């Protein structure tokens, strides 16, 4: 089958042919329709330090997808041939304390599709049936293909009650921009997002941001004053991994505020702990998606009017994958879709 793989220890990916995956007793085989390019895939493309330490070579990658079940293992129940599915990209052990307690997103033995094992940038993907998630017919293939990052945004944004709250989001990548739409959808009052990328800040405005602030030109304090915010933000969502953005977020929080961290800052990042301690801030780390509560909430929000369509800005046939990666690398894109229909 055709697949997009890391064949050598260096930058780039190669469209090549690999063996079709075998289907285990508890697996489903998915014929891929659409995939989306993730920030993780950009790390793999660049072959940065993280990728060099993490990605086995050779291996085909990718973990954002939608497709159709074409084969099932003999032990699979609850699915049928022809079901349209996306899937949870974190494969968990099922036996550790967190898995057995229903907290699979905290499994210490997690294996990542397209990171630690063969991925979805291929004509076919085999995964445990447990990880597959049926997509309702009213949700498009394009939106279903981005359920993985949509889930990151949902898990982060819904970590705290947002109804009537003032929310600060630092980092206007696709996940941060989707978090804007989620926060507004569930009832936040002011949703302010910061970045230095005008293209993505404009996307955030289209997704409903109260203010989208280019911090290289505009003061967050001035924006807060314009919005008549006298006490600070109630909830902060850190999506950038940029130390200066995290510092600004902490300084802008109200006393008793709540902070969710999805962005990954450098390991030795220093912060002003006075901001945390004397303000009584609650800080929560976010990894992946809650299985499968996050997935059900994603569907419910889309079915109740959440519009994420502006976040999908580019579409390419898989044979033009280099154009797709170029769009992502340019910084002037939202989500980029690769179409496998003609593969």
From Swiss-Prot:
User: What's its catalytic activity?
Assistant: L-threonine + NAD(+) = (2S)-2-amino-3-oxobutanoate + NADH + H(+)
Q: In which pathway does it act?
A: Amino-acid degradation; L-threonine degradation via oxydo-reductase pathway; glycine from L-threonine: step 1/2
Q: Extract one GO cellular component term from the record.
A: cytoplasm
What cofactor is needed? Answer: Zn(2+)
Q: What is its main location?
A: cytoplasm
Query: What EC class is this?
Result: oxidoreductase
- UniProt xrefs under Pfam families: ADH_N (PF08240), ADH_zinc_N (PF00107)
Extent of the signal sequence: none
What does UniProt list as catalytic?
40 (charge relay system), 43 (charge relay system)
**Function according to Swiss-Prot or TrEMBL:** Catalyzes the NAD(+)-dependent oxidation of L-threonine to 2-amino-3-ketobutyrate.
Q: What is this protein called?
A: L-threonine 3-dehydrogenase
Q: Which organism is it from?
A: Burkholderia thailandensis (strain ATCC 700388 / DSM 13276 / CCUG 48851 / CIP 106301 / E264)
Q: Which taxonomic lineage does the organism of this UniProt entry have?
A: Bacteria, Pseudomonadati, Pseudomonadota, Betaproteobacteria, Burkholderiales
């Amino acid at each position: 089958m055709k697949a997009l793989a890391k064949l050598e220890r260096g930058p780039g990916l190669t469209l090549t042919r690999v063996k079709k995956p075998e289907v285990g007793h508890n697996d489903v085989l998915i014929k891929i329709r659409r995939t989306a390019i993730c920030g993780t895939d950009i790390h793999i493309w660049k072959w940065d330090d993280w990728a060099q330490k993490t990605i086995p070579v050779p291996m085909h990658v990718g973990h954002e997808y939608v497709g159709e079940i074409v084969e099932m293992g003999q032990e699979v129940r609850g699915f049928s041939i022809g079901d349209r599915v996306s899937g949870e990209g974190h494969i968990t052990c099922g036996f550790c304390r967190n898995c057995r307690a229903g907290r699979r997103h905290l499994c210490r033995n997690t294996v990542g599709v397209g990171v630690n094992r063969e991925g979805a940038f291929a004509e076919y993907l085999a995964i445990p049936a447990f990880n597959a998630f049926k997509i309702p017919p009213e949700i498009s293939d394009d939106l279903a293909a981005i359920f993985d990052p949509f889930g990151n945004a949902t898990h982060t944004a819904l970590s705290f009650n947002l109804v009537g709250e003032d929310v600060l989001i630092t980092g206007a990548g696709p996940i941060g921009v989707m978090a804007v739409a989620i926060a507004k959808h569930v009832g936040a009052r002011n949703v302010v997002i910061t970045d230095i990328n005008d293209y993505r800040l404009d996307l955030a405005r289209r997704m409903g941001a109260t203010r989208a602030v280019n911090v290289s030109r505009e003061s967050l304090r001035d924006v807060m004053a314009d919005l008549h915010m006298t006490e600070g933000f109630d909830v902060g969502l850190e999506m950038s991994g940029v130390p200066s953005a995290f510092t600004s977020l902490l300084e802008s929080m109200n006393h008793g505020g709540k902070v969710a961290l999805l962005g990954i800052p450098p390991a030795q990042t220093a912060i002003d702990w006075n901001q945390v301690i004397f303000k009584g801030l609650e800080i929560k780390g976010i990894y992946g998606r809650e299985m499968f509560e996050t997935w059900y909430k994603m569907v419910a929000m889309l079915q109740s009017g959440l519009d994420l369509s502006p976040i999908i800005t580019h579409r390419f046939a898989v044979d033009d994958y280099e154009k797709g990666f170029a769009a992502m690398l340019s910084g002037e894109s939202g989500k980029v879709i690769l179409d496998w229909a003609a593969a």
